Design a protein with these regions (language model features):
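Short beta-strand/loop motif that positions the catalytic acidic residue
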Residues: 107-108, 113-115, 119
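Primarily recognizes the serine-hydrolase "nucleophile elbow" in alpha/beta-hydrolase
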Residues: 40-109
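Conserved alpha/beta-hydrolase "acid-adjacent" motif
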Residues: 120-126
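Serine-hydrolase catalytic machinery in alpha/beta-hydrolase-like enzymes
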Residues: 1-56, 70, 150-157
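Conserved beta-strand scaffold positions in the cores of enzyme catalytic domains, especially
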Residues: 15-17, 83, 140-142
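Catalytic histidine neighborhood in serine/cysteine hydrolases
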Residues: 133-152
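Acidic beta-to-alpha connecting loop that harbors the catalytic carboxylate
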Residues: 117-119, 145-147, 155
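Catalytic active-site module of serine/aspartate enzymes centered on a nucleophile-bearing elbow/loop
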Residues: 154-180
Length: 180
């Protein structure tokens, strides 16, 4: 995520990175959902305070994105114009389900889902209908050959750096449309 944040910044997209308490404390077991969503809300408030004049989009990688969506489903996140998910974890590995997406119908801002075709935590055959159900609020951008961390197989001929640039360009273009 650090490289992604750096590349987004280079493209003119400011980022605020944060960690959940369990990560800060180097624990393996995640905090309770209430703690995770409260952390998201606190991070959004900090971003608004630090950069009140910038357009604000919230999101994250994997569980960070899912917890951001859960916080947004509980009520609007002040100042947030849209949500960006880098590898939305739709289900645990090898246990396909859409239950983790049930709350997304309560999110009221546009959502960008960035997913790799080799993502073990999001079967695209399940994610596509989830996004379709969300209608114009959901945009799905698929990265051919990328895994959950957006890494590519060497034999693909596409570098991780190229994928990173693709993600940055997609986020920038999508955010520009939302700001209009």
């Amino acid at each position: 995520m650090e490289n992604l944040a750096d590349e987004l910044a280079a493209a003119g997209v400011a980022t605020l990175r944060y960690q959940f308490p369990y990560m800060e404390e180097r624990r393996r077991v995640p905090d309770a959902p209430a703690v995770l969503t409260a952390t998201v809300v606190a991070a959004v408030r900090a971003a608004v305070k630090e950069a009140p004049d910038l357009p604000l989009f919230a999101g994250g990688k994997s569980m960070g994105g899912r917890m951001t969506s859960q916080a947004a489903a509980q009520g609007p996140l002040d100042g947030v114009r849209g949500l960006v998910f880098f590898g939305f974890p739709l289900h645990p590995p090898k246990r396909p389900s859409t239950k983790r997406a049930d709350h997304l119908t309560k999110v009221t801002v546009p959502m960008l889902f960035l997913q790799g075709t080799r993502d073990d935590l999001a079967d695209l055959g399940l994610l596509r209908p989830v996004c379709a159900k969300l209608g114009p609020l959901a945009t799905l951008s698929v990265v051919q050959g990328a895994d959950h961390s957006f890494h590519m197989l060497k034999r693909s001929g596409t570098s991780d750096t190229a994928v990173l640039q693709q993600l940055v360009q997609t986020v920038g273009s999508w955010a520009a449309k939302i700001r209009e």
